């Protein structure tokens, strides 16, 4: 926040450290970005910080994502050789529907009952423990300048750029969907414009030109990514669109950009598994690197009521969890965002935040599977489907004749 006015007459001024009211330093580029010269961390040996005791309970301790250790500077990420960095973007000033997604990152972190880093996080579907396979950290939240969209988006881009430059995969907790514009641009800055593809799960196309009268909106990020050249239209795969927007003119524009779009009508007709197979093939077709953008409203409001623009008739929670894991395992991802979780509209059981939390865990499992070379389509461990090591039914009971 800027404090340009004179504070000499502020009766609290003498209680603050020298320089407290000075304009914050602008974020730098690459590894000279956020945190690189943080006064609180100056002189500290780089590496991960562990704010929780080992195996801390789910609802105790300090609520980092899954009680992960903390990285505060790019140097921490590099020194610890972090594979996955979870970070929040608590921003909803570009939402046009119900507000509250600025509280999304906190809710996604705090809803988890699973317990702490150091406990087993074993996937029953795959028998892969991402927390054992990967070095992961919570990187805190991007800097936000309330009321200043241009500055905030610049800072988001640079903040995420520091993560990508360090070699870690950013998993981004939104926030409204407009943050995908600076976030995916940061990824394209690193890997090259035109080299990144996006699989976009959403009830809405988010390809508007301006909504309402503003270029920066949660209904416009995909158009801006295409128009800038960061992510060409042919590198977009969209899944789950339904409802009453966009209009034909925008759909024609999407076709002109060669976007691949799978509407709920196709999913209902052919089944989610077949459509997901098409999406995986399309994701492998064009781009060298894959970014997943998950708007939680792709799921039916029965599974995700806590969102700004709910649309009935969506996919199930099981559909999205499997889809995210499959893409991360079979294709491999370089970044992911989960956006549009609005805690004020969630139910008492926090099912929307918990679904977002589990989608991230499935992405982590998929990343670990990809690193292990477990990339066969729709892999499930034999034990999870009732088989023993030889492929026979486990503990089978034979009926008497």
Predicted features along the sequence, with ranges:
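N-terminal acidic, proline/glycine-rich, low-complexity intrinsically disordered segments
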Residues: 1-7
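Conserved alpha-helical scaffold segments that buttress catalytic/binding sites
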Residues: 3, 13-401
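Intrinsically disordered, low-complexity repeat tracts enriched in Pro/Ser/Thr
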Residues: 8-12
């Amino acid at each position: 926040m800027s404090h340009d006015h004179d504070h000499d007459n502020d009766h609290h001024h003498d209680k603050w450290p020298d320089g407290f009211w000075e304009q914050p330093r602008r974020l730098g580029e690459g590894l000279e970005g956020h945190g690189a010269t943080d006064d609180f961390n100056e002189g500290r040996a780089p590496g991960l910080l562990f704010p929780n005791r080992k195996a801390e309970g789910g609802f105790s301790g300090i609520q980092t994502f899954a009680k992960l250790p903390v990285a505060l500077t790019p140097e921490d990420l590099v020194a610890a050789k972090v594979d996955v960095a979870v970070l929040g973007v608590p921003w909803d000033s570009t939402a046009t529907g119900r507000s509250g997604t600025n509280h999304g990152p906190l809710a996604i972190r705090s809803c988890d009952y699973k317990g702490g880093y150091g406990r087993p996080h074993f996937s029953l579907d795959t028998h892969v423990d991402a927390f054992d396979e990967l070095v992961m950290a919570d990187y805190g939240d991007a800097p936000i300048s309330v009321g200043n969209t241009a500055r905030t988006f610049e800072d988001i881009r640079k903040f995420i750029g520091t993560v990508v430059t360090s070699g870690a995969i950013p998993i981004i907790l939104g926030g409204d969907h407009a943050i995908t514009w600076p976030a995916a641009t940061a990824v394209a800055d690193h890997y090259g414009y035109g080299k990144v593809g996006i699989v976009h799960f959403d009830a809405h196309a988010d390809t508007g030109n301006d909504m309402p009268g503003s270029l920066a909106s949660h209904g416009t990020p995909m158009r801006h990514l295409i128009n800038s050249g960061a992510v060409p239209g042919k590198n977009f795969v969209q899944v789950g669109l339904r409802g009453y927007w966009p209009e034909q003119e925008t759909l024609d524009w999407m076709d002109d950009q060669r976007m691949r779009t799978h509407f709920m009508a196709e999913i209902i007709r052919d089944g989610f598994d077949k459509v997901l197979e098409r999406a995986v093939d399309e994701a492998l077709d064009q781009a060298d690197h894959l970014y997943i953008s998950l708007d939680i409203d792709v799921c039916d409001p029965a599974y995700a009521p806590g969102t700004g623009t709910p649309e009935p008739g969506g996919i199930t929670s099981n559909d999205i969890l499997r889809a995210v894991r499959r893409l991360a395992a079979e294709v491999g991802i370089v970044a992911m965002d989960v956006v549009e979780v609005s805690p004020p509209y969630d139910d008492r059981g926090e099912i929307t935040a918990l679904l977002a939390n589990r989608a991230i865990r499935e992405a982590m499992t998929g990343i670990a599977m990809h690193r292990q070379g477990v990339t066969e389509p729709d892999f499930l461990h034999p034990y999870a489907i009732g088989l023993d090591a030889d492929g026979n039914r486990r503990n089978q009971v034979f009926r008497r004749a």
